[in-house]
């Protein structure tokens, strides 16, 4: 019976127009975040939820979850400011990381000298499958922690981007086993 209900819910959601799909997903996002036990703010007008989560033991950052132009976005600023002289290495590391990311992308803002990680998915895909909201948020959070660690190693320890990426790939191999 549960499968039938899920199938009927999917069929119904497929018939909704884009505005109704966005409205339905927004309600589910709010419900999900209200059930969680972390500080968050819900901004109705912007259809954005901001949650403060720990990237490291000593550093928390604001993660944003938004609905914009038919897309579901997960975004976090990994590095708020980096030394200008490290710009070439920041770009090299960003390029390497974008090549190994399964979804989402790392971007660098040269004016603000910050680094962000964003996942963007179609609203309909996120709406159709139960658990996708949690899965997206969880995956975004786990990857953001790893990316933040990579950029921190570059900035604080002045480690070469190639070595940082090699260590990430090695740890991913271990996790797969």
Regions found by a protein language model. Name each.
Residues 54-86:
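Long, continuous compositionally biased terminal/linker segments
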Residues 77-118:
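Short, internal acidic amphipathic alpha-helical interface segments
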Residues 47-49, 72-74, 113-115:
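Hydrophobic residues embedded in beta-strands of well-ordered beta-sheets
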């Amino acid at each position: 019976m549960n499968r039938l209900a899920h199938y009927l819910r999917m069929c119904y959601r497929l018939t909704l127009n884009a505005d109704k799909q966005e409205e339905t997903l927004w309600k589910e996002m709010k419900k999900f975040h209200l059930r969680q036990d972390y500080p968050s703010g819900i901004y109705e007008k912007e259809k954005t939820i901001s949650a403060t989560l720990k990237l490291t033991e000593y550093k928390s950052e604001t993660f944003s979850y938004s609905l914009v132009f038919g897309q579901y976005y997960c975004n976090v600023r990994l590095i708020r400011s980096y030394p200008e002289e490290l710009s070439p290495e920041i770009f090299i590391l960003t390029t390497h990381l974008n090549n190994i990311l399964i979804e989402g992308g790392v971007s660098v803002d040269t004016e603000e000298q910050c680094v962000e990680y964003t996942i963007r998915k179609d609203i309909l895909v996120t709406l159709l499958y139960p658990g996708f909201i949690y899965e997206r948020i969880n995956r975004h959070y786990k990857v953001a922690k790893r990316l933040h660690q990579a950029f921190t190693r570059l900035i604080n320890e002045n480690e070469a981007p190639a070595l940082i990426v090699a260590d990430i790939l090695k740890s991913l191999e271990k996790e797969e086993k």
